Amino acid sequence: MALRSARGDGPTSGRWDGGAEKGDFNAKRKKKVAEIYQALNSEPTDVAALRRMAISEGGLLTDEIRRKVWPKLLNVNTNDPPPISGKNLRQMSKDYQQVLLDVRRSLRRFPPGMPEEQREGLQEELIDIILLILERNPQLHYYQGYHDIVVTFLLVLGERLATSLVEKLSTHHLRDFMDPTMDNTKHILNYLMPIIDQVNPELHDFMQSAEVGTIFALSWLITWFGHVLSDFRHVVRLYDFFLACHPLMPIYFAAVIVLYREQEVLDCDCDMASVHHLLSQIPQDLPYETLISRAGDLFVQFPPSELAREAAAQPQAEKTAASTFKDFELASAQQRPDMVLRQRFRGLLRPDERTKDVLTKPRTNRFVKLAVMGLTVALGAAALAVVKSALEWAPKFQLQLFP
């Protein structure tokens, strides 16, 4: 059951950052909607263009568009969604009681003012989706916070389509969170401090001295920020971004939040309790579009492959959610980027030109910022690199193309 009657299909990402005049804003929005539908109606579907639209300013704009685009980003066939039979699994599932407790505590994840009967119905559907996915994929292990991701897809897509997308997400982007241990989850968290160190060595050293660790970001990572953000518009905007990008992009976004709060952190007492308390209370008025742009820039500047050695000393440093994608490549026939984009990929993304001036960092000056942080992911070469990386990791179905 999609949530059309409760929230409608208006914009869910709020006004775009930048303070443009209303007329200009509306014109940009109409242009973007037209470009999205042009990509959707291409034969085959222009998934590369859809990824650019999801990353760029404002994201996918409405839940109606998300219902069409999110399945394309995950390469899910919407013509044959799985049957819903989770209710039959409640008595036999070892996870049922924990799932039930978590779902009962999820009241704030539903829109304010939603009729109680409708919310309770959605909570029942949420339980069924989770139990069905776990039953169909016995290698997956439920974790607290998983329901925060599932409910976002349920509210946008409805039960049947949400089941298909979350199942694909669970076996790829979220796979490491669903291991029997937290080892791989902790490894992904280990990317946080190396990213911060590349941009702001003083902030990194302060946090190391405080011994704050990375546990403050655990709920951000494993729920894709769904558990910590109160405005649903911000949550789905981030999901647009994450679904269009490499599976490790959420940890880059976590890093830019910490970097954005640099002065608050440095003004703290340099002890674990003070810094952890500050960082675990995520502000609700973050400049999301700016942070999305910066996260994309940092991913281009410092890709996971370059940070793996710092993230973990052992040779299996790349054993993260990204590793589950290595058997997936999109056939070129499934994509239709135009020649201009191809030329920009070839001409603008030369690592020697993009990185030579910023990889040497002074250890003492916290005001030194990367020039790349000024790039705009929505328009610049960084966006193309992020999309290109996402396409390299994106799922494929043998010879099955999008309808």
Curated annotation (Swiss-Prot):
Transmembrane region(s): 238-258, 367-387
Q: Where is this site: Arginine finger?
A: R105
Keyword DNA repair in the entry? The reply is no
Record keywords: GTPase activation, Membrane, Transmembrane, Transmembrane helix
- What superkingdom does the record give? Eukaryota
> Where does the protein end up?
Membrane
Principal place where this protein is found?
membrane
GO MF annotations for this entry?
Answer: GTPase activator activity; small GTPase binding
Which membrane topology term applies here? Answer: Multi-pass membrane protein
Keyword field contains Transmembrane: yes
Gene Ontology BP term (one): positive regulation of ER to Golgi vesicle-mediated transport
Where in this protein does the record put region Disordered? 1-29
For bias kind Basic and acidic residues, which ranges apply? 18-27
Rab-GAP TBC domain ranges (all copies): 60-246
Task: State a single Pfam family of this protein.
Answer: RabGAP-TBC
Query: What are its GO cellular component terms?
Result: endoplasmic reticulum membrane; Golgi membrane; nuclear membrane
The protein's matches in SMART domains, at most eight in alphabetical order, are given as:
TBC
Task: Tell me which residues are marked as the site Glutamine finger.
Answer: Q144
> What does the UniProt entry state concerning the protein's domains?
The arginine and glutamine fingers are critical for the GTPase-activating mechanism, they pull out Rab's 'switch 2' glutamine and insert in Rab's active site.
What this protein is reported to do is described as:
GTPase-activating protein (GAP) specific for Rab1 and Rab2 small GTPase families for which it can accelerate the intrinsic GTP hydrolysis rate by more than five orders of magnitude. Also shows GAP activity for RAB18 GTPase. Promotes RAB18 dissociation from the endoplasmic reticulum (ER) membrane into the cytosol, probably through stimulating RAB18 GTP-hydrolysis. Involved in maintaining endoplasmic reticulum structure.
Name assigned to this protein? TBC1 domain family member 20
What is the organism field in this record?
A: Bos taurus
Q: Which gene encodes it?
A: TBC1D20
